Swiss-Prot record:
Keyword Transcription applies: yes
CDD domains cross-referenced by the UniProt entry: Sigma70_r4 (cd06171)
Protein name as catalogued: RNA polymerase sigma factor sigC
Protein's GO biological process: cellular response to light stimulus; DNA-templated transcription initiation; regulation of RNA biosynthetic process
Pfam families: Sigma70_r2 (PF04542), Sigma70_r3 (PF04539), Sigma70_r4 (PF04545)
PANTHER family recorded: RNA POLYMERASE SIGMA FACTOR RPO, RNA POLYMERASE SIGMA FACTOR SIGC
Short sequence motif Polymerase core binding: positions: 360-373
DNA-binding region coordinates: 531-550
Gene expressing this chain: SIGC
Region described as Disordered: 1-25
Organism: Arabidopsis thaliana
Main location: plastid
Assigned protein family: Belongs to the sigma-70 factor family.
Keyword set, alphabetical order: Chloroplast, DNA-binding, Plastid, Sigma factor, Transcription, Transcription regulation, Transit peptide
Length: 571
């Protein structure tokens, strides 16, 4: 007889019966594996079941006799073998639980196997065979009917189990594809959020099977939401949330002055660190400024570039210490310029549209930062950014006053012009004076009337001589503007007459005296020369040339025709 492999039926398959309530034995389905070559080639198995009464009645129309006959159902062997081992894991676990349950009685106490060679069978007798032959046969028939009902339920449970196994396989395939796509963690998170949904409830049995497999999938819920709620609750507790108080007590709670501990701001340490760094940086800038001032003084005294040794000797230190101080100062200067870039950009917006490029304004702002760092004193309690704003504005305004106009105006006049403009705006807004007099402006600003009038002359608009006179004219201002460099005919005649009279006057002097006077005042080439130059030309000292000049001037004053030259001075 062939060997059989037996395994317990899970709880979905096992039914209960009153006739077998006292029995504690578990029903088993006996399965014999096919070992012959014919079974291997067909890859199938036969299951023998007893026919239902309706099926039997339908078959009676085709057969004359009412004898019972077995029904064989062919099932593919590949599907049975594939599902057998995955099914055994869950069945064995459940069998341990239900073996101790005495309330679960087994209805099919006796199962007579019907074996055939090279096949697997499960045999149940016909419940209606030989009706009315005896009480023993009736009891056997009733037991057979009960066994058939239990078998139908078992087959239905087996079908549901196979469907669940397909779901497990499909879920594994989904997890494998998600892992290849790199979205396994996201899929697990989304699946854990809907843990209590209907999809999870439908796959509850499947989850038990997955937990027993070696490739166990563990779904860990995120604690981000829990941490967020905890932070909100802590913030609410610190702020004194009154949502838990009754409505009548909330107004009373608002009126109570609760003493609170004054905590230092979080950025206090940061502010202290920034101020300390600014103090150190300004100290380094001062060191470099002092060293450069010493070098400039040496170069002015010696008239040449100062060497490193002379520079170190004048500073009272060795060359190594001098280079160390210079490098430290240069580093501090660069860091200070970088840290104040945002402040310089903010202040440069006020000087846009005044004829200066934005890059030039930024450079002027950096110069102001270095000037302020040289004069910054941290012991007064002011921040460096507050103190240096004045120097940044001053440097930018100085550049605007120097290069914004085509005609250069001194910075003192520029300040006076700014004061005048502010005074006019004040008189217009407060007193309603649209055109204020110079005396009123002088009284308000404190400047003299003469200085205010000189400043008003500088406020005139400077235009181009190549600009057209009007929109309808093609004539330019250059055509109407006189050329002051050209002499008029009257001036040319007067100049020639004066030169002739001077030469006639010099004829009464000695040749050496006449030569010195011509070179001294440029009467020949219109280029006057100094005493030293004349001495080099005549190869004498400049003191000797001075004596000759004095003697010649004394002779010219004593001549009678010298009074005739006064006519040219009055013209």
């Amino acid at each position: 007889m062939a060997s059989f492999n037996s395994f317990p039926i899970p709880k979905q398959i096992v039914g209960s019966s009153s006739s077998s309530s006292s029995s504690t034995s578990r029903p088993r389905i006996l399965v014999r594996s096919s070992l012959t070559s014919s079974m291997t080639s067909t890859n199938s198995m036969l299951v023998f079941v007893h026919p239902h009464p309706l099926i039997k009645h339908w078959l009676s129309l085709l057969r004359s006799d009412q004898t019972s006959f077995p029904i064989f159902v062919r099932i593919p062997m590949t599907s049975v073998v594939a599902t057998r081992w995955s099914f055994l894991s869950s069945v064995k676990e459940e069998s341990r639980i239900y073996q101790n349950d005495s309330l679960k009685a087994c209805g099919c106490a006796s199962v007579s196997p019907y074996t055939a060679q090279n096949n697997v069978y499960v045999e149940l007798k016909d419940p209606k065979e030989n009706i009315g032959v005896g009480s023993a046969e009736r009891s056997y028939s009733s037991r057979s009917m009960l066994q058939y009902n239990l078998l139908a339920k078992n087959l239905l449970a087996l079908e549901e189990t196979f469907v669940a196994l397909d779901s497990v396989r499909m879920e594994r395939d989904i997890m494998l594809q998600m892992g290849k796509l790199g979205a396994a963690e996201l899929f697990k998170t989304c699946l854990s959020r809907y843990r209590g949904s209907s999809i999870t409830s439908c796959l509850s049995d499947t989850t038990e099977l997955v937990d027993t497999t070696p490739n166990q999938q563990v779904f860990v819920s995120s604690r981000r939401k829990v941490k967020k709620k905890a932070r909100r609750s802590s913030v609410t507790a610190e702020n004194g949330d009154q949502s838990s108080l009754p409505i009548g007590l909330r107004t009373t709670w608002n009126n109570i002055d609760v003493p609170r501990v004054r905590r230092p701001p979080k950025y206090r340490k940061k502010r202290e660190r920034i101020s300390r760094n600014e103090t150190e940086m300004s100290t380094g800038v001062k060191i470099v400024a002092d060293m450069e001032r010493i070098r400039t003084q040496l170069e002015e005294e010696s008239g040449k570039v100062a060497s490193l040794s002379c520079w170190a000797a004048a500073a009272g230190m060795n060359e190594k210490l001098l280079m160390r101080n210079l490098h430290y100062g240069w580093y501090c200067r660069d860091e200070l310029v970088k840290s104040t870039r945002s402040l310089v950009l903010f202040l440069a917006r006020n000087y846009r549209g005044l004829g200066i490029a934005h890059e030039d304004l930024i450079q002027a702002g950096y110069v102001g930062v270095l000037q302020g760092a040289e004069r910054f004193d941290h012991t007064r309690g002011y921040k460096f950014s507050t103190y240096v704003q004045y120097w940044i504005r001053k440097s930018m305004s100085t550049m605007v006053s120097r290069h914004a106009r085509g005609v250069h105006i001194p910075s003192s006049i520029i300040r006076t012009i700014n004061h005048i403009q502010k005074a006019r705006k004040t008189l217009k807004t407060s007193h309603g004076i649209k055109y204020a007099a110079d005396e009123e402006i002088a009284k308000l600003t404190g400047h003299s009337v003469k200085k205010i009038r000189a400043a008003n002359q500088c406020l005139k608009v400077v235009g181009s001589i190549d600009k057209k006179v009007g929109d309808c004219f093609t004539t330019k201002f250059l055509e109407f503007t006189p050329d002051t460099t050209m002499e008029s005919p009257e001036e040319a005649v007067m100049r020639q007459s004066a030169r002739r009279d001077i030469h006639d006057l010099l004829e009464g002097l000695e040749p050496r005296e006449k030569q010195v006077m011509v070179l001294r005042y440029g009467l020949q080439d219109y280029r006057p020369k100094s005493l030293e130059e004349i001495g080099k030309l005549l190869k004498v000292s400049k003191e000797w040339i001075r004596k000759i000049e004095r003697r010649a001037m004394a002779k010219l004053r004593d001549q009678p025709n010298a009074e005739d030259l006064r006519y040219y001075l009055n013209q």
